[in-house]
Amino acid sequence: AHYPDEIVISKAIKRLYDWTELLKPSRKGIGKSKQMGLWGEMFVLHEYMSGVHPIKDAVNFWIGPDNKKQDFTLNHMALEVKTTMSGSAPAIKITSIEQLERITDRLYLIHIFMNKGNEPDALSLNDLYDQIIESINDDTETKTNFLFSVSKIYGKATDTERNEKFVFLNYNLYEVDENFPNILGGDLPDAI
């Protein structure tokens, strides 16, 4: 496709601006909840999505850092990732009502259980980041897409948050269908 020069320049300037915003040193920390959420999403990306799909597709399916309704969307399905420490309350915290609204034919919720650890199989955000970069190899476009997405949260994490190690314990996978307990936005009064 041929684009007018103004569009190409405009898109390039926007991309450069986005990168400068992301690369600003603002490593104030992301907090435990976002740290665990990012760990879970990166774990699913590396351990499950890239095991079933080419890494290029797996990275493109990952939209969690973009504050979309679900964390992964592909074809006619979506996947929401929730990560909790073992021993936490069994309830899964949903941060917005839209997270469990189906906009695809199928919606799944994967609940990852983890613990802090220092065993050989324990992984930090840095470890997952490095493993994903390594699996991308020399695909510059995929690497750029991954770096752009991950930097939205990872770029704000402190060194302590990036290096804290967790051990994957188990997961539960649920299909969010008409029998799944949830509240839909259309069910709520306008005042809420």
Which residues make up each language-model segment?
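Nucleic-acid endonuclease domains
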Residues: 1-67, 84-192
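Conserved catalytic cores of phosphodiester-cleaving nucleases, focusing on short active-site segments
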Residues: 48, 72-85
